[in-house]
Amino acid sequence: MAKEISSELLNTILTRVGGPGNIASCGNCMTRLRLGVHDSSLVDPNIKTLEGVKSVILTSDQVQVVFGPGKAHRAAKAMSELLGEAPVQDAAEIAAQNKRQLKAKQTSGVQQFLAKFATIFTPLIPGFIAAGLLLGIATLIATVMHVPADAQGTLPDALNFMKVFSKGLFTFLVILVGYNAAQAFGGTGVNGAIIAALFLLGYNPAATTGYYAGFHDFFGLPIDPRGNIIGVLIAAWACARIEGMVRRFMPDDLDMLLTSLITLLITATLAYLIIMPLGGWLFEGMSWLFMHLNSNPFGCAVLAGLFLIAVVFGVHQGFIPVYLALMDSQGFNSLFPILSMAGAGQVGAALALYWRSQPHSALRSQVRGAIIPGLLGVGEPLIYGVTLPRMKPFVTACLGGAAGGLFIGLIAWWGLPMGLNSAFGPSGLVALPLMTSAQGILPAMAVYAGGILVAWVCGFIFTTLFGCRNVNLD
């Protein structure tokens, strides 16, 4: 295990979050150890001062400890082992020490709500990336080698095999989301999965594709299973709340037999009567809003320019339902490459800091250690190790990202909208083969590469001109 995530460091973190008895869950995303906590008043915000910890994001029920790419998974695994061995400690003394500090650190209700999306979607991200990469590589090979869609032979069969994973993922994605969402909101995962499946079924007996539900109306009322992910999230939340209320009044002897049964009946009724139409309206409204922002160059610039701030506050996972809505409405995720420009702006800013700093300075060492992950789309090392501590370069990095977003928005406005072939995927240079458009994969790759180049150059120029004044370059 790397020095930065030694057992001593993890034991210190465990103590400062209130001890094992305060830990509700332990997980990770690509760069962060995510610890769910029972009582946030027991958490010491000075965890971020520990050597090896890049930053800490606090919400009402979760502590996100930023380690960087490749380390978060090892940290989560080691922390889980510690939690399995450690006795529960009395954290009253820690609470008394931290209570006054944390009064100024309360997170907003919006941030708490968006933090739920990390719990729901983070476990799905590796699958999104894998399926998207396979689809992108297969599409690129088919385009370059001019393989017709109806071709026969070993190569077409291999390409179809590579594409089948994304088809399977997006066909049954709502069931995975329903399961995770019900758990995130405090319910039973399988109940959420069953309710989500209602959105997947077909209600037209004449349809030749899909899975017919066996009825076409709900006691005479029409069924319109629109809304997809938006509707499923609402239904999973309702399912978890209803389950909690039912369980409160259910005798223990009947809990196993009747709680889920009653929960499903009530939630399904609400889904058919209220949630499906409501989810459909929200889905259409959200799609309309972001499609118009995407087609507006200045809207694209604003989105790209603000995304790094969302990452800092740990709420960037809240965009994932929007990605899924855009996949349904457009066939590709046009928002993701725009937001990816934020990371490219950071790369440009970091290169400017490297150029302006002394040959043997600590800053150059920091940039060298963080620039490769930044080029590959992992921005936290640059954020927390290079730009954010110096503030001005962070602002100029945001401006560089905004310039890249403006470029992509202008190209879309001129008639070439493009996007990611998956709801979620890697950013940076790794995402190049995942780009697609109505005009094909190669034009989309060219637009994305152009946006990255613009963000690099503008981030470099803005930081050189405005981001290095009165900034510690040692």
From Swiss-Prot:
GO molecular function ontology, one term from the record: protein-N(PI)-phosphohistidine-sugar phosphotransferase activity
Chief place of localization: membrane
Enzyme Commission numbers on file: 2.7.1.192
UniProt topological domain (Cytoplasmic) ranges: 1-123, 179-180, 239-260, 323-334, 390-393, 462-474
Membrane topology category: Multi-pass membrane protein
Subcellular location: Cell inner membrane
Occurrences of domain PTS EIIC type-1 (ranges): 115-474
Domain PTS EIIB type-1: from-to ranges: 1-89
Keywords assigned by UniProt, alphabetized: Cell inner membrane, Cell membrane, Kinase, Membrane, Phosphotransferase system, Sugar transport, Transferase, Transmembrane, Transmembrane helix, Transport
Residue positions of the active site: 29 (phosphocysteine intermediate)
Catalytic activity: N-acetyl-beta-D-muramate(out) + N(pros)-phospho-L-histidyl-[protein] = N-acetyl-beta-D-muramate 6-phosphate(in) + L-histidyl-[protein]
Gene Ontology biological process terms in this record: phosphoenolpyruvate-dependent sugar phosphotransferase system
Superkingdom, natural source: Bacteria
Assigned GO CC terms: plasma membrane
Periplasmic side: 145-157, 202-217, 282-301, 356-368, 415-440
Keyword RNA-binding tagged: no
Ranges that cross the membrane: 124-144, 158-178, 181-201, 218-238, 261-281, 302-322, 335-355, 369-389, 394-414, 441-461
UniProt cross-references to PROSITE patterns, sorted A to Z: PTS_EIIB_TYPE_1 (PS51098), PTS_EIIB_TYPE_1_CYS (PS01035), PTS_EIIC_TYPE_1 (PS51103)
A Pfam family recorded for this sequence: PTS_EIIC
UniProt free text on domains: The EIIB domain is phosphorylated by phospho-EIIA on a cysteinyl or histidyl residue, depending on the transported sugar. Then, it transfers the phosphoryl group to the sugar substrate concomitantly with the sugar uptake processed by the EIIC domain.
Entry function: The phosphoenolpyruvate-dependent sugar phosphotransferase system (sugar PTS), a major carbohydrate active transport system, catalyzes the phosphorylation of incoming sugar substrates concomitantly with their translocation across the cell membrane. This system is involved in N-acetylmuramic acid (MurNAc) transport, yielding cytoplasmic MurNAc-6-P. Is also able to take up anhydro-N-acetylmuramic acid (anhMurNAc), but cannot phosphorylate the carbon 6, probably because of the 1,6-anhydro ring.
Protein name listed in UniProt: PTS system N-acetylmuramic acid-specific EIIBC component
Organism this protein belongs to: Shigella boydii serotype 4 (strain Sb227)
